[in-house]
C-alpha cells in the first residue's frame, strides 16, 4: 500500500514550481532593485507552492504627487494583462539609462506596478484564486439591478465560475491587498489613475470605467471625459471603445467600484479597466477555443508581440497625463460644460 500511495502521488512532483510571468517579474525586480521600491503585500499558497504578491514603485516620494497604478493578473487565466504590465516595467528600466525626459517626469509623478495580483490562480491556470473566488466579484457591494446569470457574480459555490465568496466573509487576501495598495498609494493623493489589464471579452479592445454595479454617473465623469478626449486627439486611430462598464453588463462585487467609492471625495481617483478583446484572436486562430489559455490570450508569438506594442501608447499617455494634470483637470464652469458633454456622449438614450 505504501508503494501504491507513493506511485499515486508521484505525478504531483512533475507540476512546475513556478510560471513564466512570475519568473519574469522576479527578474525585473532583481534588475530594477536600485530603482524600484519593492514590497510584498501578501502571499498565497496553492498545492504546496507559495507565491508572493509584489508591488514595485518608482518616481516622486511626495505624497501629494500624482500617481498611476498599473495592475494585471487579477484573473489567473488572463496572462496577457500581466505580460503587458511586465513589458512596460522592463521598457521603463531600459529607458532610465538614457531618457532624460522620463527621468524628469518621474521627479513629479509616481508609478506603482502590481503586475500579478493572483499568482496562485495563474500558476493553477484558473480564473479564480486558490480558494476558488473570483477576485473581481469579491467586494461586498451588490449591483442595484439584475446582473447576468452567474457571470454577474454568484454565491452558490466555488464549483461554479464567478464565485463571490461567502456573504459576510473577509475579502480574499489578494483582493484586500489590492485595495490597501489603492488606498495608501493612489487614492490618498489629489490625483491618481489606475489601469487594470484584463482580457477575454469582446471583438475589440475596451477601456471601461465605473460603475459596474449601477448605471448611475460616477462623480468624476467630466475628468474621465477629458481624459478620453485627450487620448483620442493624441492617438486618433486607437480603436478602443471608451465607456462606462455598465454599458456592457452589471456585476456584483467589482473591486474598482468599491475602491472608487471609498476614495476621499476631495481627491480625483480615476480607475479604468483595459479589456483586451480575445474573440478576434480566436476568430483568426479557431483552435484556441480548445485551450483554456487560448480563450483569453493570444497564442501565436507575433500576435502577442503586436498586443504588447499596441497598448504601450496607452500606458505612456496616462503617465504624461498625470505629469501634466494642472493643464487639463477641469474646474468651475468648464467642468459643468464637460459634464453635459459626457452625459450627451454616454448617457443619452441613443448612446445606451
Model region roles, listed by residue range:
Residues 66-73:
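Short beta-strand element of the alpha/beta-hydrolase
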Residues 38-49:
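N-terminal cap/lid segment of alpha/beta-hydrolase-fold proteins
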Residues 64-65, 80-128:
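Short helix-loop-beta-strand segments that form the rim/entrance of peptidase-like active sites
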Residues 54-64:
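Short beta-strand-to-loop junctions in surface cap/lid or active-site-entrance loops
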Residues 75, 117-118, 200, 277:
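Catalytic metal-binding/acid-base residues of hydrolase active sites
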Residues 2-28, 32-35, 149-352:
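C-terminal accessory segments enriched in acidic
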Residues 73, 113, 135, 195-198:
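Divalent metal-coordination and catalytic microenvironments
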Residues 115-158:
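Surface-exposed loop and adjacent secondary-structure segments within mature catalytic domains
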Amino acid at each position: 500500500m505504501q508503494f501504491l500511495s507513493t506511485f499515486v502521488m508521484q505525478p504531483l512532483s512533475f507540476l512546475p514550481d513556478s510560471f513564466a510571468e512570475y519568473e519574469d517579474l522576479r527578474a525585473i525586480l532583481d534588475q530594477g532593485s536600485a530603482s524600484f521600491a519593492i514590497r510584498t503585500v501578501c502571499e498565497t499558497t496553492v498545492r504546496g507552492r507559495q507565491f508572493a504578491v509584489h508591488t514595485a514603485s518608482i518616481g516622486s516620494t511626495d505624497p501629494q504627487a500624482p500617481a498611476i497604478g498599473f495592475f494585471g493578473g487579477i484573473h489567473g487565466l488572463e496572462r496577457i494583462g500581466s505580460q503587458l504590465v511586465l513589458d512596460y516595467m522592463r521598457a521603463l528600466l531600459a529607458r532610465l539609462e538614457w531618457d532624460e525626459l522620463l527621468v524628469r517626469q518621474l521627479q513629479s509623478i509616481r508609478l506603482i506596478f502590481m503586475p500579478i495580483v493572483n499568482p496562485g490562480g495563474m500558476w493553477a491556470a484558473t480564473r479564480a484564486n486558490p480558494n476558488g473566488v473570483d477576485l473581481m466579484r469579491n467586494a461586498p457591494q451588490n449591483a442595484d439591478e439584475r446582473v447576468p446569470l452567474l457571470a454577474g457574480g454568484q454565491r452558490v459555490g466555488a464549483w461554479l465560475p464567478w464565485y463571490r465568496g461567502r456573504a459576510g466573509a473577509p475579502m480574499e487576501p489578494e483582493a484586500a491587498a489590492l485595495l490597501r495598495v489603492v488606498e495608501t498609494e493612489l487614492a490618498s493623493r489629489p490625483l491618481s489613475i489606475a489601469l487594470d489589464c484584463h482580457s477575454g471579452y469582446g471583438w475589440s479592445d475596451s477601456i471601461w470605467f465605473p460603475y459596474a454595479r449601477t448605471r448611475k454617473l460616477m462623480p468624476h465623469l467630466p475628468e474621465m471625459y477629458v481624459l478620453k478626449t485627450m487620448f483620442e486627439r493624441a492617438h486618433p486611430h486607437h480603436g478602443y471603445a471608451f465607456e462606462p462598464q455598465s454599458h456592457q453588463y452589471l456585476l456584483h462585487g467589482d473591486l474598482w467600484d468599491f475602491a472608487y467609492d471609498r476614495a476621499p471625495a476631495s481627491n480625483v481617483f480615476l480607475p479604468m479597466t483595459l479589456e483586451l478583446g480575445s474573440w478576434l484572436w480566436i476568430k483568426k486562430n479557431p483552435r484556441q477555443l480548445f485551450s483554456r489559455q487560448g480563450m483569453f490570450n493570444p497564442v501565436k508569438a507575433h500576435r502577442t508581440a503586436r498586443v504588447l506594442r499596441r497598448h504601450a501608447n496607452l500606458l505612456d499617455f496616462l503617465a504624461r497625463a498625470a505629469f501634466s494634470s494642472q493643464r487639463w483637470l477641469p474646474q468651475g464652469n468648464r467642468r459643468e460644460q464637460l459634464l453635459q458633454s459626457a452625459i450627451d456622449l454616454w448617457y443619452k438614450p441613443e448612446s445606451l
